[in-house]
Amino acid sequence: ALINVVANIDENYFPVYWKDYSKVNSLRVITVEALVRSSDWTDGRDNALSTIFGVEGEFLVRIGDGDRPRDQYQCVAPGGNFPGANVVDGLPVDEFVHIATVYNADTGERSYYKNGEKVYSDNSATRAIDLSSSCYIGYSWEPGRWLPGEISEVRVWNVARTAEEIASNPYMVDPHSEGLIAYWKFNEGTGSKIIDHTGNGNDLTGNTTPTWINVELPELKK
C-alpha cells in the first residue's frame, strides 16, 4: 500500500508556522490538495463547518457553510466564496476523497477537483493571497470548526497543478516536485509532530496528539 496510516484530527488543529514567510505572503497561484475521510460530515455540525486548510477570510478550504449542507465543499478566496450553495454534490462518507483547489490570479481561474475530476471552475480570481499568518489545518474562526475525521497527503503548491497531475497523484507525490511549498503526509503513526517532506522546514505540531488510524490505500480490490 502507498498509505498505511493516517491521522484522525477530530477536535484538533495544527497551526502552520511557515519557515520562510516570503514564500507564502503573495501567492498569485496556489494549489492545495488533501485526502480526507469522515464517517459523518453533518452530525453535530449544526452551526459549524469543517476546516481543511487556510486562513480565515483570506483563503480557506473547508466543507460546509451556513448557506449549504455541511457536506458541500467551499473555498473562501478573493473573488468570493466558491462554488455557490448546492452547485456541487456533497462529499461521500466512510471513504477517502481527494480534494484539490487551484487558484490562479494570473489567468483568473479558480477550480475545485474531487477525486481528480474538475467539478467546478470559474474566472473570478483577482489578486495574490497571503497565507503568512493565522494559517491552520483543522481550525478557522473558532474551535468548533474542526475536521470530523481523517486527513492525509496535504500539499501546498505555488503552481497550478493540471487536471492530469491532480488525478494521477492522490496518494503520493515526489517531495521535491517543482513548486511544492509544503507536503504533510500525516503518516507518522505516533506523537503530534507532522513532518514537511519537502525539506522546506514547515513542520507542524498538533494542538493535541491525533488518533493514528491504520489504513490501506489505495484500497486493494477484493
Model regions and ranges:
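Extracellular glycan-interaction patches encoded by glycine-rich segments
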Residues: 79-82, 121-122, 131-153, 161-173
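Extracellular/lumenal carbohydrate-interaction signature centered on repeated Trp-anchored short motifs
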Residues: 20-32, 88-97, 127-129, 143-150, ...
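Extracytoplasmic low-complexity segments
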Residues: 1-12, 167-222
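Aromatic-rich beta-strand patches that line glycan-recognition/binding surfaces
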Residues: 33, 43-59, 137-138, 167-171, ...
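Residues that flank catalytic or metal-binding motifs in active/ligand-binding sites
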Residues: 28-30, 49, 57, 95, ...
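Extracellular, beta-strand-rich glycan-interacting domains
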Residues: 30-40, 97, 145-171, 181-190
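Extracellular glycan-interaction surfaces
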Residues: 1-11, 33-42, 56-126, 141-142, ...
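Residue-level detector of conserved, well-ordered beta-strand and adjacent loop positions
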Residues: 10, 19, 54, 100, ...
